């Protein structure tokens, strides 16, 4: 079915980071993972030729399909303009104002994985089922101390529960990407730890993971300009030694939040 659509419209892929999922088994498993109901409005980013769109529309109340490539937008209109429950939005998903939606299910363009994920996580929705490059997906769910534990892990953990649903081999796509992929399930929820100031916490995580191999004391001192703290030495001198002598990659999200909160409180006192 998918190959026939690609042939009919002379779609080659490769433009706009396009890799079309052509394996029907994986398409069906993605839809099943979304646990759709007839009441759900589903957002799909990078709808492509509509092979996932079509399956989503069978189970959901409405599908909002976002696509950047004008050629593919034309394909989507040709295939689905008669469908009452599919809305097609032509545009860049990073710039489009998303309508309200309940769930997001997408084979994401890999080049915008980080940006689009955190744009999504700032929206209210029930569940996400999203395709990423495999290594990116692993970084989203890695425990502290692992080589893949990163800023991405912390940021994801702050906004949502994340788990790998399945690994998808590169041969399931046309054209095949260079690496395997994985499907992540995201369930947004309130932060599992206290953060005094969300913006500062996320800046702090970005700063210390930019020097992840250094002890936290040095990582903080070396990134004071990023954190906009002129009196950083005075503040660091008041932070617990057991944290300062560890690397950022060895601290749990809760511990990093604790350090960020202490710095924020001390900074607010204007030493």
Curated annotation (Swiss-Prot):
One of its GO terms (molecular function) is rRNA (adenine-N6,N6-)-dimethyltransferase activity. GO terms for cellular component: cytoplasm. Its EC number is 2.1.1.-. Keywords: Cytoplasm, Methyltransferase, RNA-binding, rRNA processing, S-adenosyl-L-methionine, Transferase. Its main location: cytoplasm. It is found in: Cytoplasm. HAMAP family: 16SrRNA_methyltr_A (MF_00607). NCBIfam families: ksgA (TIGR00755). Specifically dimethylates two adjacent adenosines in the loop of a conserved hairpin near the 3'-end of 16S rRNA in the 30S particle. May play a critical role in biogenesis of 30S subunits. Belongs to the class I-like SAM-binding methyltransferase superfamily. rRNA adenine N(6)-methyltransferase family. RsmA subfamily. This is Probable ribosomal RNA small subunit methyltransferase A. It comes from Methanosarcina mazei (strain ATCC BAA-159 / DSM 3647 / Goe1 / Go1 / JCM 11833 / OCM 88).
């Amino acid at each position: 079915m998918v190959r026939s659509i690609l042939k009919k419209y002379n779609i080659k892929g490769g433009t706009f980071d396009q890799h079309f999922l052509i394996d029907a088994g994986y398409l069906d498993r993605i839809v099943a993972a979304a646990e759709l109901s007839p009441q759900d409005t589903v957002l799909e980013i990078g709808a492509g030729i509509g092979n996932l769109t079509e399956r989503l529309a069978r189970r959901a109340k409405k599908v909002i399909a976002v696509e950047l490539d004008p050629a593919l937008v034309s394909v989507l209109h040709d295939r689905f303009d008669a469908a009452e429950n599919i809305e097609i939005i032509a545009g860049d998903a990073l710039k489009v104002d998303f309508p309200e939606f309940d769930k997001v299910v997408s084979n994401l363009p890999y080049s915008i994985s980080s940006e689009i994920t955190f744009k999504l996580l700032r929206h209210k929705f029930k569940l996400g089922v999203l395709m990423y490059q495999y290594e990116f997906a692993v970084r989203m769910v890695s425990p502290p101390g692992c080589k893949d534990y990163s800023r991405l892990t912390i940021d994801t953990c702050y906004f949502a529960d994340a788990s790998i649903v399945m690994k998808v081999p590169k041969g399931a796509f046309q054209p095949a990407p260079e690496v395997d992929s994985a499907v992540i399930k995201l369930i947004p929820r309130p932060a599992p730890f206290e953060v005094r100031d969300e913006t500062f916490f996320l800046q702090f995580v970005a700063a210390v993971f930019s020097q992840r191999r250094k002890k936290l004391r040095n990582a903080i001192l070396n990134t004071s300009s990023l954190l906009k703290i002129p009196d950083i030495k005075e503040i660091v001198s008041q932070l617990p030694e057991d944290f300062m002598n560890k690397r950022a990659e060895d601290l749990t999200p809760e511990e990093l939040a604790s350090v960020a909160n202490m710095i924020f409180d001390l900074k607010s006192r204007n030493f």
